[in-house]
């Protein structure tokens, strides 16, 4: 009796311990996922910048907003330590990303404001580390699902602010009435929702069973793009829609691949021809003038500033900081307080010189080729790696997204490029994982 009782109790205790361990693992996993979701939302810049940034000085940095980043950096370090071997392996496979970030930090030695460069270089390092963590921690499906969920939350929050709190969710002074959602400015909001639309479609492609959520959210995101009245965002969203269905045809109907490629080449050639020889008509078609709402005037003024420090730049993150510094003459000539270059390539040139532009250019071209190679070797992640990489280039032409500290676009690009350079196996809904370099099976 006693022996049996002891055996029963021991078995009961083992089962209880196993149950507790399982619960603890689920709890830790939930906490980790919650932290990752929080970090993605924080890096989006939504809501915090809207509330804390001075609308009369968009280039200024709120001390409170800066302090809020330190807890996030601590969380990134804790997450990175937990998966350190995988993170180091991912970094080793991505020397170009590491070199680009290190070069921005090295600009401390010739920076016009060394303390600012040091602080923002550390922020860039933490931003990039978070992108590498996402690449190391999650497979393609897990990454896309988490990014899509974060953007779905941002889309719903933006719609709520625009409808229920229009003094926050809509532009008040310039572009009055245009929706800006949880962002500070309508173009940032529109481009964010264009990226959200692409993520919703990619998440649906990876998990069609969740279409009841992703499809309506995609429609909401496209509606928010329209409400932002941003032409750049509309072009980006239209590209996402057309590109998604083009890749769908490419994957599903091999017999149509050659006609599809001819159609793409002819379309790009025609658009390029019209932009060169019918510039005014093309801009009028999308409701823009030649200056792209003053952007070309900004770029022309910045050419003179770039000529002063063409190879090394002014130091990472310093050009726009001092109102009496080198940016003074740009703002003086344009007669308004320009906050950024509104172009990622120009911004990078100002910060870290032509060397940084060349380094990132090599990184981007390699990433694009690896993304296109996925059309032959990859799985359902094809939609994201091809369209997301090209969309990043499109957005960088009108917004400062390249090598930007505390910026979600840079986090996502790093995560995507890092997985490409690491030759992450493709994601298939109904097939086992196989090595990247294994020849793909013919698609019927």
Q: What spans do the regions from the language model cover?
A:
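Transmembrane alpha-helical segments and their membrane-water interfaces
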Residues: 74-87, 99, 103-159, 196-202, ...
């Amino acid at each position: 009796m006693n022996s049996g009782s002891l055996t029963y109790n021991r078995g009961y205790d083992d089962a209880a311990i196993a149950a507790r361990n399982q619960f603890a693992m689920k709890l830790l996993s939930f906490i980790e996922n919650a932290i990752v979701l929080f970090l993605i939302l924080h890096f989006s810049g939504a809501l915090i910048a809207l509330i804390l940034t001075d609308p009369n000085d968009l280039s200024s940095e709120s001390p409170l907003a800066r302090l809020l980043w330190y807890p996030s950096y601590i969380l990134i370090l804790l997450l990175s330590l937990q998966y350190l071997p995988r993170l180091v392996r991912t970094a080793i496979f991505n020397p170009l990303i590491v070199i680009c970030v290190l070069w921005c930090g090295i600009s401390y030695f010739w920076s016009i404001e060394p303390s600012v460069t040091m602080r923002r270089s550390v922020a860039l390092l933490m931003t990039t580390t978070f992108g590498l963590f996402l690449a190391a921690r999650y497979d393609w499906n897990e990454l896309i699902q988490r990014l899509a969920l974060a953007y779905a939350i941002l889309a719903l929050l933006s719609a709520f602010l625009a409808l229920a709190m229009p003094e926050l969710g809509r532009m008040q002074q310039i572009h009055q009435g245009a929706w800006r959602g949880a962002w500070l400015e309508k173009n940032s909001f529109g481009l964010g929702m264009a990226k959200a639309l692409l993520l919703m479609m990619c998440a649906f492609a990876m998990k069609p069973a969740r279409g009841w959520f992703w499809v309506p959210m995609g429609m909401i995101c496209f509606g928010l793009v329209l409400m932002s009245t941003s032409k750049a965002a509309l072009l980006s969203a239209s590209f996402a829609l057309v590109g998604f269905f083009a890749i769908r045809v490419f994957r599903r109907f091999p017999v149509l691949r050659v006609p599809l490629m001819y159609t793409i080449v002819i379309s790009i050639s025609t658009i390029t021809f019209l932009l060169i020889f019918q510039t005014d008509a093309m801009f009028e078609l999308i409701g823009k003038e030649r200056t792209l709402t003053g952007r070309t005037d900004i770029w022309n003024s910045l050419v003179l500033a770039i000529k002063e420090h063409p190879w090394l730049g002014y130091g990472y993150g310093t050009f726009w900081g001092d109102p009496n510094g080198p940016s003074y003459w740009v703002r003086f000539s344009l007669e308004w307080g320009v906050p950024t270059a509104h172009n990622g390539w120009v911004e990078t040139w100002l910060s870290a010189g032509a060397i940084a532009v060349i380094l990132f250019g090599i990184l981007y071209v390699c990433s694009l080729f690896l993304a296109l190679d996925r059309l032959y070797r990859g799985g359902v992640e094809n939609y994201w790696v091809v369209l997301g990489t090209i969309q990043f280039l499109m957005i960088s032409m009108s917004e400062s997204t390249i090598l930007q500290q505390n910026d979600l676009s840079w986090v996502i690009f790093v995560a995507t490029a890092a997985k490409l350079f690491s030759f992450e196996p493709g994601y298939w809904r109904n097939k086992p994982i196989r090595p990247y370099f294994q020849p793909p099976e013919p698609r019927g």
